[in-house]
Regions:
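Domain-start "cap" segments at the beginnings of catalytic or binding domains
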Residues: 1-35
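Signature of lipid phosphatidyltransferase scaffolds
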Residues: 2-10, 20, 131-172
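N- and C-terminal low-complexity/disordered segments
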Residues: 5, 10, 27, 47-56, ...
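Short secondary-structure transition/capping segments
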Residues: 17-23, 85-95, 118-132, 150-163
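Short, well-ordered alpha-helical scaffold segments within catalytic/effector domains
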Residues: 24-27, 31, 59, 63, ...
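Primarily the HKD phosphodiesterase
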Residues: 33-98
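HKD (HxKxxxxD) catalytic microenvironment of the phospholipase D
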Residues: 41, 103-147
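Long, hydrophobic, amphipathic alpha-helical segments used as structural scaffolds
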Residues: 45, 73, 78, 102, ...
C-alpha cells in the first residue's frame, strides 16, 4: 500500500541560478517558490499587479503553504495596496483566515524608491526582478549565500513598513 510522502521527503534540490526573461516564466517561478517554502515567504512588489497574484491557483498555493507549515510567516510589502484590495480578494481572504501568519504592509517613504520586486522562500530560494518595468529576473534555488543580501534588502524595506491592509475590519 502506497503511503503519502511529505514535501520534506522530496529529494534534495540541486543549487541553481537562472535568468528569466518573461513575466510568464516569473509567474511559474513564483509558484515553484511557494511550493518549496516551508516556513517563511517574504514578498516585496510595487503592487502585485504582475505575476498572477490575483488567480485562484495562486491563492490555493498560498493557502497550501499556510496550512502545511508549522508556524508559517507570509510577509508582504507593497508600495500601493489599491490593486491588491480591488483585484486579489482571495489573498485578502487568506489574510483574514490566517491573520496570525500573514502581514501586509505598505512601504514607508524611505523605501518608495525600491523598484526591484523580490520573493524569498526560507532565506534559501528567491526570485529577484531587476526592475518592475522590465521582465528580467534572477531565479535561484538552494542558494542561501546569494539570498542573504536580498534578505537584508527585504528587511530594510520591511523596516520602513506602515500598516497596509488589516485582517480585521474595526468600526462601529
Amino acid at each position: 500500500m502506497a503511503t503519502p510522502t511529505s514535501p520534506d521527503d522530496a529529494p534534495p534540490i540541486a543549487p541553481s541560478e537562472t535568468v528569466l526573461d518573461t513575466v510568464a516564466a516569473q509567474s511559474a517561478a513564483i509558484d515553484e517558490l511557494i511550493g518549496l517554502a516551508r516556513q517563511r515567504l517574504q514578498i516585496f512588489d510595487v503592487d502585485l499587479s504582475q505575476g498572477g497574484w490575483q488567480t485562484a491557483a495562486r491563492a490555493e498555493k498560498m493557502a497550501t503553504f499556510l496550512r502545511r507549515a508549522t508556524h508559517p510567516r507570509l510577509e508582504l510589502i507593497v508600495h500601493d495596496t489599491r490593486w491588491l484590495e480591488v483585484s486579489c480578494p482571495r489573498l485578502l481572504a487568506l489574510q483574514r483566515l490566517h491573520a496570525g501568519a500573514v502581514t501586509v504592509y505598505r512601504t514607508g517613504v524611505e523605501a518608495r524608491g525600491a523598484m526591484d520586486p523580490l520573493l524569498i522562500a526560507d532565506g534559501r530560494h528567491f526570485l529577484h526582478r531587476f526592475h518592475f518595468s522590465q521582465p528580467r529576473a534572477s531565479f535561484a534555488l538552494e542558494q542561501p549565500q546569494l539570498a542573504r543580501p536580498l534578505v537584508t534588502r527585504f528587511e530594510e524595506i520591511w523596516a520602513t513598513g506602515e500598516p497596509g491592509l488589516s485582517a480585521t475590519v474595526l468600526g462601529l
